[in-house]
Swiss-Prot record:
PROSITE patterns: ASX_HYDROXYL, DSL, EGF_1, EGF_2, EGF_3, EGF_CA. Residues 199-207 are annotated as: Important for interaction with NOTCH1. GO terms for biological process: angiogenesis; aorta morphogenesis; aortic valve morphogenesis; blood vessel remodeling; cardiac neural crest cell development involved in outflow tract morphogenesis; cardiac right ventricle morphogenesis; cardiac septum morphogenesis; cell fate determination. The lineage of its organism: Eukaryota, Metazoa, Chordata, Craniata, Vertebrata. Ligand for multiple Notch receptors and involved in the mediation of Notch signaling. May be involved in cell-fate decisions during hematopoiesis. Seems to be involved in early and late stages of mammalian cardiovascular development. Inhibits myoblast differentiation. Enhances fibroblast growth factor-induced angiogenesis (in vitro). Pfam families: DSL, EGF, EGF_DL_JAG, EGF_TEN, hEGF, JAG1, MNNL. The keyword Thylakoid does not apply. The gene is JAG1. Widely expressed in adult and fetal tissues. In cervix epithelium expressed in undifferentiated subcolumnar reserve cells and squamous metaplasia. Expression is up-regulated in cervical squamous cell carcinoma. Expressed in bone marrow cell line HS-27a which supports the long-term maintenance of immature progenitor cells. Changing residue 908 to Q: In biliary atresia; extrahepatic. It comes from Homo sapiens (Human). This is Protein jagged-1. Disulfide bonds join 187-196, 200-212, 220-229, 234-245, 238-251, 253-262, 265-276, 271-282, 284-293, 300-312, 306-322, 324-333, 340-351, 345-360, 362-371, 378-389, 383-398, 400-409, 416-427, 421-436, 438-447, 454-464, 458-473, 475-484, 491-502, 496-511, 513-522, 529-540, 534-549, 551-560, 578-605, 599-615, 617-626, 633-644, 638-653, 655-664, 671-682, 676-691, 693-702, 709-720, 714-729, 731-740, 748-759, 753-768, 770-779, 786-797, 791-806, 808-817, 824-835, 829-844, 846-855. Changing residue 664 to S: Found in a patient with pulmonary stenosis; uncertain significance; the mutant is able to activate Notch signaling. Changing residue 207 to A: Strongly reduced NOTCH1 binding. Glycans are attached at residues 143, 217, 382, 559, 745, 960, 991, 1045, 1064.
Length: 1218
């Protein structure tokens, strides 16, 4: 018994053999290849990242370009299964890789193809599915351990690619950077097919004798056949039934058979005159008999034994009898009674009779009893030097070699007589030979071989033409010289334009263009807007070295590719599920309405009642949020077993082998390459063909006369069997058909793709094309639709299959929880109360006379007007007046509203009862044209006129105001009455008109077409107030501060107020000079007044009448003029005037920048005295200091001492100035 150690050693070779077989089996059944990607060029002219920042830190402060440091560019690649909608998430199921840093902002690597630094190789060991999705990202490498790497640009591509040595070039021409790259899929050695899963390794040994063609099919070597090419092809004609062979051309017979082709049987041993049809038979020939067919049944006919004319008779098997003629005797009549009578001696021999018969004397050269044998004169050989002896009659002849001659070849022949030397100077005869003295360039025995002078002469793969005693090099393109040793400099002519740098290459050159230029010669000014990198309808503007995208309001980013979140930095008000309001300076209302983007990128939102919405989806999409891609493959449009891949409002058919066309409706003509040889006729089949062979030719392509099988007969590893007049293919798993050319689709049965994925067959493997929302090799991974988080206001996101749902916090609603539920929508507050919506609640603001949580408790009496009940405290508008219910009493403002405007083409429908639409007079049109504009008037009623005259003043309860307008800021069609009506509707009149009856009338100025005279009067005047002065001051203050949100007020350029003229006091100096006591009293009075004025702090500015101090009048200081900041200093600008000796008060527009300016204004209000100047002007003035530089004075520039305001007459005549 062997020890365990001994058994272990004996079992080790067996285990190694099993492991080797398993490895071989795995390699044969597997797949192997690689996906290759090469970066060709990169163009990032600004050195920017995708987020707009610079690769090298801050921008250049001069031109704001990223020129301080270039990007350290490298690339990352992710290869995954085919996706109709590319997603960045999910695993790189086919592989991933990256390059080292290969360049800066801009580089071109096309000239250095094959460099491993810019190449990424992703090996795979599965059947290549042909369809794929590729993600390529350009990154900036950061050496800083704190600052991570940043992405520059990324590109994605989905498509199909078959294994090939050819490269496929792709470009990324949108975004911050443009780059170009090429891809290909190659199978490893010994792997073939679209999936690199067909294994074929050439061999010539016991297991097979074959090579591999370009499709991986085994091509048998000459003399071999069979699926593994291990069956030798026997000698042509070798019986396939009774012969065989182990080596090509051999024919070894089976037992019992013989012959060159093993087609003859071996007869029974000893069979003499017999044949056989099967081995060991002895079938006698005619006239033969016996067990061994050795008995002659016709001896006379067979042997003719009787001589000299004797007659033969058969007497039995192998027996006969001769009847001899006269003079002959013997068994065969061979004895002649006269021996020489029959002339027995041949070749002219003489016969002599003897006692025993006869005797022959032969002539020279013959011998034998009857002189029939020729004497061999060549024995022994008489020819020398290898001459050949030919026997003659009574002699011989020597056939000598060329070097010898003579009867017995003993003489040396002169070979030079035959002139054997072709290209020689001379011929010299030698013993048994000769010598040719060759000319230069020739060699050989006869100087007929041209010496090859090309060996090692030509460089750089040039071809050499051999000459006589010389050579000539034919240079490839790009080289020159006798030996093609010199590279032609294609840059010598300076072909690059616009400062491009020429880089010399083999038979070509490359221009490295400066920034902003492109083309082979840098002749093209790069249009960075072609193709347009801007997305979502943005306008592209080309720059010298970059482009600029003017994004729509709803998008942002370098290429306007990102949806702008307006509510991120600006407070938004949710209107409904579809609309969000945000503050904007681009609209007159100051509000812009934007979409909530609830329907995503594939739909438009339509609001419904109750906060609901519907989505109007783009073509190809459906679902609540337009998130579902409509399955265009549902109708099965692909024919003949084609696989349908759904797209967006489209589909694509991946056809089965043998079919093509948009719907896989066209059978590929497999006869187009004329595969049939030797006159065979081709008939097209599905993914196959059939050759109808003629004239004895056989095989799939009529190429053989020996066998129906060859290397191309059965496809995809099928085994071919020759059945005489036809062949039969035994197909491996997954294939069927006459020549194993049809895939069974078994790899997709049952469907391995989950969640509605489409299975695409590739031989024995498959690929899943996933629906949107799913990813992974078998579509089993759900895409996270909640990333990034889409829900607002603390809403919870629930992820679904290509959808999500927001579960909102209390108080919020809508698809993304952006809508604050309006608890005021149900009007919970009592009539007249104001409901204030809050988060998950509301609050009621009660009007006067109401109380309670919902203002349901009433404390005042309601009013009844026009048949309606108005609650206590409620307000409403009545034409240009405002009314309010006060505990059962209606109180309204009392402003005369003037005639109502109307349109002539509408007739009297716009006018009250009893009035008609009368066209306005031409002088009443303030801003032309006023076509079709009228006023509602009654023929019985005369226009209301105020009691103001041209010399009316505040003391008369009247005001005359002149407005100067900038017509460029006013709309055409405005009438004088339109302007007057807007003045009547100013809010500043509401409180005043509640106590007094106010009349405002307007007339165009007869002297200037941009001025309107306004007369304001009041009734019911009491002694304790002057409403006209209050109204005038408020109008001037409103114009000065641009308050009121009115386009009319914004168009006012100047305001002048008529006031009472001042009287000159000629006796002012008399009391001043009378005594020092009077001067002291005036100073005390001025001091007291100044103290009171500071304490009051009224908003107006004050004026006083000019004193009669001639010294003060001599120093005339101009006041600041307030001008409209919108008014341009053009031809229509009203000049600043000094209205001397005129009863007017003028105000120009002054800007107010802040409350601080108002406080400063109050602190620095002063009074000034001017002789003979009752009109005052307040302006914004720029004064020049001594150095000539203009400076802006803050609002009020009058620095006059307040002590000058000591006159009582000045106090009485103080006016407000704005």
């Amino acid at each position: 018994m062997r020890s365990p150690r001994t058994r272990g050693r004996s079992g080790r070779p067996l285990s190694l053999l099993l492991a080797l077989l398993c490895a071989l089996r795995a390699k044969v059944c597997g797949a192997s290849g690689q996906f290759e990607l090469e970066i060709l060029s990169m163009q990032n002219v600004n050195g920017e990242l995708q987020n707009g920042n610079c690769c090298g830190g801050a921008r250049n402060p001069g031109d704001r370009k990223c020129t301080r440091d270039e990007c350290d560019t490298y690339f990352k690649v992710c290869l995954k299964e085919y996706q109709s909608r590319v997603t960045a998430g999910g695993p790189c199921s086919f592989g991933s890789g990256s390059t080292p840093v290969i360049g800066g902002n801009t580089f071109n690597l096309k000239a250095s193809r094959g460099n491993d630094r810019n190449r990424i190789v992703l090996p795979f060991s599965f059947a290549w599915p042909r369809s794929y999705t590729l993600l390529v990202e350009a990154w900036d490498s950061s050496n800083d351990t704190v600052q991570p790497d940043s992405i520059i640009e990324k590109a994605s591509h989905s498509g199909m690619i078959n294994p090939s040595r050819q490269w496929q070039t792709l470009k990324q021409n949108t975004g911050v950077a443009h780059f170009e790259y090429q891809i290909r899929v190659t199978c490893d050695d010994y792997y073939y097919g679209f999936g690199c899963n067909k294994f074929c390794r050439p061999r010539d040994d016991f297991f097979g004798h074959y090579a591999c063609d370009q499709n991986g099919n085994k091509t048998c070597m000459e003399g071999w056949m069979g699926p593994e090419c291990n069956r030798a092809i026997c000698r042509q004609g070798c019986s396939p039934k009774h012969g065989s062979c182990k080596l090509p051309g051999d024919c070894r017979c089976q037992y019992g058979w013989q012959g060159l082709y093993c087609d003859k049987c071996i007869p029974h041993p000893g069979c003499v005159h017999g044949i056989c049809n099967e081995p060991w038979q002895c079938l006698c020939e005619t006239n033969w008999g016996g067990q061994l067919c050795d008995k002659d049944l016709n001896y006379c006919g067979t042997h003719q034994p009787c001589l000299n004319g004797g007659t033969c008779s058969n007497t039995g098997p192998d027996k006969y009898q001769c009847s001899c003629p006269e003079g002959y005797s013997g068994p065969n009549c061979e004895i002649a009674e006269h021996a020489c009578l029959s002339d027995p001696c041949h070749n002219r021999g003489s016969c002599k009779e003897t006692s025993l018969g006869f005797e022959c004397e032969c002539s020279p050269g013959w011998t034998g009893p009857t002189c029939s044998t020729n004497i061999d004169d060549c024995s022994p050989n008489n020819c020398s030097h290898g001459g050949t002896c030919q026997d003659l009659v009574n002699g011989f002849k020597c056939v000598c070699p060329p070097q010898w001659t003579g009867k017995t070849c003993q003489l040396d022949a002169n070979e030079c007589e035959a002139k054997p030397c072709v290209n020689a100077k001379s011929c010299k005869n030698l013993i048994a030979s000769y010598y040719c003295d060759c000319l230069p360039g020739w060699m050989g025995q006869n100087c007929d071989i041209n010496i090859n002078d090309c060996l090692g002469q030509c460089q750089n793969d040039a071809s050499c033409r051999d000459l006589v005693n010389g050579y000539r090099c034919i240079c490839p393109p790009g080289y020159a010289g006798d030996h093609c040793e010199r590279d032609i400099d294609e840059c010598a002519s300076n072909p690059c334009l616009n400062g491009g740098h020429c880089q010399n290459e083999i038979n070509r050159f490359q221009c490295l263009c400066p920034t902003g230029f492109s083309g082979n010669l840098c002749q093209l000014d790069i249009d960075y807007c072609e193709p347009n990198p801007c997305q979502n309808g943005a306008q592209c503007y080309n720059r010298a070295s970059d482009y600029f995208c003017k994004c729509p309001e709803d998008y942002e980013g370098k290429n306007c590719s990102h949806l702008k979140d307006h509510c991120r930095t600006t407070p938004c008000e949710v209107i409904d599920s579809c609309t969000v309001a945000m503050a904007s300076n681009d609209t007159p209302e100051g509000v812009r309405y934007i979409s909530s983007n609830v329907c995503g990128p594939h739909g438009k939102c339509k609001s419904q009642s109750g906060g609901k919405f519907t989505c109007d989806c783009n073509k190809g999409f459906t679902g609540t949020y337009c998130h579902e891609n409509i399955n265009d493959c549902e109708s099965n449009p692909c024919r003949n077993g084609g696989t349908c891949i759904d797209g967006v409002n489209s589909y694509k058919c991946i056809c089965s082998d043998g079919w093509e066309g948009a719907y896989c409706e066209t059978n590929i003509n497999d006869c187009s390459q004329n595969p049939c040889h030797n006159g065979g006729t081709c008939r097209d089949l599905v993914n196959d063909f059939y050759c109808d062979c003629k004239n004895g030719w056989k095989g799939k392509t009529c190429h053989s006369r020996d066998s129906q099988c060859d290397e191309a007969t059965c496809n995809n590893g099928g085994t071919c069997y020759d059945e005489g007049d036809a062949f039969k293919c035994m197909c491996p798993g997954g294939w069927e058909g006459t020549t194993c050319n049809i895939a069974r689709n078994s790899s997709c049965l049952p469907n391995p793709c989950h969640n509605g994925g489409t299975c695409v067959v590739n031989g024995e493997s498959f690929t899943c094309v996933c629906k949107e929302g799913w990813e992974g090799p078998i579509c089993a991974q759900n895409t996270n639709d909640c990333s990034p988080h889409p829900c607002y206001n603390s809403g919870t996101c629930v992820d679904g299959d290509n959808w999500y749902r927001c579960e909102c916090a209390p108080g919020f609603a809508g698809p993304d929880c952006r809508i604050n539920i309006n608890e005021c929508q149900s009007s919970p507050c009592a009539f007249g109360a104001t409901c204030v919506d809050e988060i998950n609640g509301y609050r009621c603001v009660c009007p006067p006379g109401h109380s309670g949580a919902k203002c349901q408790e009433v404390s005042g009496r309601p009013c009844i007007t026009m048949g309606s009940v108005i609650p206590d405290g409620a307000k409403w508008d009545d034409d240009c007046n405002t009314c309010q219910c006060l505990n059962g009493r209606i109180a309204c403002s009392k402003v005369w509203c003037g005639p109502r405007p109307c349109l002539l083409h509408k007739g009297h429908s716009e006018c009250p009862s009893g009035q008609s639409c009368i066209p306005i007079l031409d002088d009443q049109c303030f801003v032309h044209p006023c076509t079709g504009v009228g006023e509602c008037r009654s023929s019985s009623l005369q226009p209301v006129k105020t009691k103001c005259t041209s010399d009316s003043y505040y003391q008369d309860n009247c005001a005359n105001i002149t407005f100067t307008f900038n017509k460029e800021m006013m709309s055409p069609g405005l009438t004088t009455e339109h302007i007057c009506s807007e003045l009547r509707n100013l809010n500043i009149l509401k409180n005043v008109s509640a106590e007094y009856s106010i009349y405002i009338a307007c007339e165009p100025s007869p002297s200037a077409n941009n001025e309107i005279h306004v007369a304001i009067s009041a009734e019911d005047i009491r002694d304790d107030g002057n409403p006209i002065k209050e109204i005038t001051d408020k109008i001037i203050d409103l114009v000065s501060k641009r308050d009121g949100n009115s386009s009319l007020i914004a168009a006012v350029a100047e305001v002048r107020v008529q006031r009472r003229p001042l009287k000159n006091r000629t006796d002012f100096l008399v009391p001043l000079l009378s005594s020092v006591l009077t001067v002291a009293w005036i100073c005390c009075l001025v001091t007291a007044f100044y103290w009171c004025l500071r304490k009051r702090r009224k908003p107006g500015s004050h004026t006083h009448s000019a004193s009669e101090d001639n010294t003060t009048n001599n120093v005339r200081e101009q006041l600041n003029q307030i001008k409209n900041p919108i008014e341009k200093h053009g031809a229509n600008t009203v000049p600043i005037k000094d209205y001397e000796n005129k009863n007017s008060k003028m105000s120009k527009i002054r800007t107010h920048n802040s409350e601080v300016e108002e406080d400063d204004m109050d602190k620095h209000q002063q009074k000034a005295r001017f002789a003979k100047q009752p009109a005052y002007t307040l302006v914004d003035r720029e004064e020049k200091p001594p150095n000539g530089t203009p400076t802006k004075h803050p609002n009020w520039t009058n620095k006059q001492d307040n002590r000058d305001l000591e006159s009582a007459q000045s106090l009485n005549r103080m006016e407000y100035i704005v």
